[in-house]
């Protein structure tokens, strides 16, 4: 494993500025790691020529002495982000061969800050999944293993490639997106830090849409400080996205003091689930004690509508997806099915979508179309929207009562084996989002921080939920938790 590729963003920034290393050396080290890690299935489109050109430009900026924090930092980009001239398929066969003519706002801001793109990362198809098993490229694999077993484990989803690449030190950090937990759950499964910002903090323009009222881009990094640095480059108002907030972007890194004395941390009783593993329960209690020892006040809180969050999410998200995915018709871009003589436009739509969309995407399109249909709109979709408003109100009331952040588990288990859920009811897979979906429904910021290992040696994470637009405060609380937890474990290299 290259010493350079295992650097954090902050450490690499300091070495680059001190001229101890060059962006080109750092990029070459990461490209070599990517080249040797095919077994992880993390990178699906490599861009070495682009990376070298960007690194050269970064070195010139560094020499001139006015380089931003992200200058020369090699990243992986989730395949959901449109990257100009580089395949951007959302891990779906229906977008086979699609190379956008434009750059997403988030990636263009990262590149403007001098970041280097090593390539595109694996994910669940259209970000629909919790295990990276719905990808047209095949599975991404978790670099961690259970004890002495060689069972291939999931890196989580949908940002599974991002999680795997960062945990295996193939890149210094990666972009992710989070619709119901797709940054936080994989981050917890691989022992890295993942931040879902407040809805509207990062532009959605140029990110392939899943559920437009829930999707949000965020950083997946090796520690909390790196999350703060990378979020600063990703965030900001974008007139091309009507949901993007016209708010200044603070210096998130400068807010990392680690001082949380007097902060009130809420512990929601509704997150104590039946059948929750004892290890998760114990980790949660330990995390609460760590924050209390750091000077925070713990307060038991209630979020009474939590139990309705998953059903509401799995009505709203597929409904929005069925609308968004209607644009994939074989006419404008991507895959078009071969037609038989006499086939008309209806057959073209049917065959193209049958060939192009995977089973999970088809399932969600059908659920979404069903809940939006005339006879069921009020019974399902409208009711789910009302539940969403109640969930948001629960959080508003807790924050209004003086709570600064809420501590919960990030996931209901450690990483499971690839294929282990295949025979299960799809709802079993959906339960992976049980601790994370409320954050998306309420539009709040949430961060997963690695906090320990289970008895099989797999990472477990805790989640902190913050007030809207107060990512700096949330990151500082996460920083205090990270320091107290002292998580430094790395996977043993087998790939």
Swiss-Prot record:
The annotated active site, in chain numbering, is: 78 (charge relay system), 158 (charge relay system), 182 (acyl-ester intermediate)
Q: Which UniProt keywords apply?
A: ATP-binding, Ligase, Nucleotide-binding, Protein biosynthesis
Reaction catalyzed? L-glutamyl-tRNA(Gln) + L-glutamine + ATP + H2O = L-glutaminyl-tRNA(Gln) + L-glutamate + ADP + phosphate + H(+)
Presence of keyword Protein biosynthesis: yes
Tell me yes or no: is Transferase among this UniProt entry's keywords. Answer: no
Instruction: Specify the enzyme's EC class, one word.
Output: ligase
GO cellular-component term (any): glutamyl-tRNA(Gln) amidotransferase complex
Any GO molecular function: glutaminyl-tRNA synthase (glutamine-hydrolyzing) activity
* Disulfide-linked positions: none
E.C. code: 6.3.5.7
GO biological process terms, semicolon-separated: translation
Q: What does this protein do?
A: Allows the formation of correctly charged Gln-tRNA(Gln) through the transamidation of misacylated Glu-tRNA(Gln) in organisms which lack glutaminyl-tRNA synthetase. The reaction takes place in the presence of glutamine and ATP through an activated gamma-phospho-Glu-tRNA(Gln).
* Record text on subunit structure and interactions: Heterotrimer of A, B and C subunits.
Protein family per UniProt: Belongs to the amidase family. GatA subfamily.
UniProt protein name = Glutamyl-tRNA(Gln) amidotransferase subunit A
Instruction: Tell me the name of the encoding gene.
Output: gatA
């Amino acid at each position: 494993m290259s010493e350079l590729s295992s650097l954090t963003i902050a450490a690499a920034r300091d070495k680059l500025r001190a001229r101890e290393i060059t962006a080109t050396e750092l990029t070459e080290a990461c490209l070599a790691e990517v080249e040797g890690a095919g077994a992880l299935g993390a990178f699906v489109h490599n861009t070495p020529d682009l990376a070298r050109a960007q690194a050269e430009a970064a070195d010139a900026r560094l020499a001139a002495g006015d380089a931003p924090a992200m200058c020369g930092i090699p990243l992986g980009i989730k395949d959901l982000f449109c990257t100009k001239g580089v395949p951007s398929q959302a891990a779906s066969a229906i977008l086979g061969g699609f190379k956008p003519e434009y750059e997403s706002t988030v990636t263009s801001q990262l590149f403007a800050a001098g970041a280097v793109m090593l390539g595109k990362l694996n994910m669940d198809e259209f970000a629909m999944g919790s295990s990276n098993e719905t990808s047209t490229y095949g599975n991404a694999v978790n670099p961690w293993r259970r004890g002495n077993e060689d069972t291939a484990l999931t890196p989580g989803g949908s940002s599974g490639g991002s999680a795997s690449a960062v945990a295996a030190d193939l890149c210094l950090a990666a972009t992710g997106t989070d619709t119901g937990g797709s940054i936080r759950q994989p981050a917890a499964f691989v022992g890295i830090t993942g931040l879902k910002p407040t809805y509207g903090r990062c532009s959605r323009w140029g990110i392939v849409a899943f559920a437009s009222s829930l999707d949000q881009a965020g950083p997946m990094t090796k520690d909390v400080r790196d999350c703060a640095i990378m979020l600063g480059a990703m965030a900001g108002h974008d007139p091309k996205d009507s949901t993007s907030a016209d708010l200044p972007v603070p210096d998130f890194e400068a807010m990392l003091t680690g001082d949380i004395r007097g902060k009130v941390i809420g512990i929601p009783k509704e997150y104590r689930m039946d059948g929750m593993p004892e290890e998760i329960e114990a980790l949660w209690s330990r995390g609460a004690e760590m924050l209390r020892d750091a000077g925070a006040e713990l307060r038991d809180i209630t979020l009474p509508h939590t139990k309705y969050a998953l059903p509401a999410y799995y009505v709203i998200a597929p409904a929005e997806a069925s609308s968004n995915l209607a644009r994939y018709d074989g006419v404008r871009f991507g895959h078009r099915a071969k037609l038989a003589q006499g086939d008309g436009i209806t057959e073209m739509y049917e065959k193209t979508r049958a060939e192009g969309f995977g089973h999970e995407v088809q399932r969600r399109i059908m659920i979404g179309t069903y809940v939006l249909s005339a006879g069921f709109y009020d019974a399902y979709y409208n009711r789910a929207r009302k539940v969403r408003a109640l969930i948001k109100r629960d959080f508003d009331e807790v924050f209004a009562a003086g709570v600064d952040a809420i501590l919960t588990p990030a996931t209901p288990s450690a990483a499971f084996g690839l294929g282990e859920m295949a025979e299960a009811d799809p709802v079993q897979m959906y339960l992976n989002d049980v601790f994370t979906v409320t954050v998306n429904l309420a539009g709040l910021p949430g961060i997963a921080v690695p906090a320990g290992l289970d008895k099989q040696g797999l990472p477990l994470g805790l989640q902190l939920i913050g007030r809207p637009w107060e990512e700096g405060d949330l990151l500082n609380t996460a920083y205090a938790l990270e320091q107290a937890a002292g998580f430094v474990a790395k996977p043993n290299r087998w790939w």
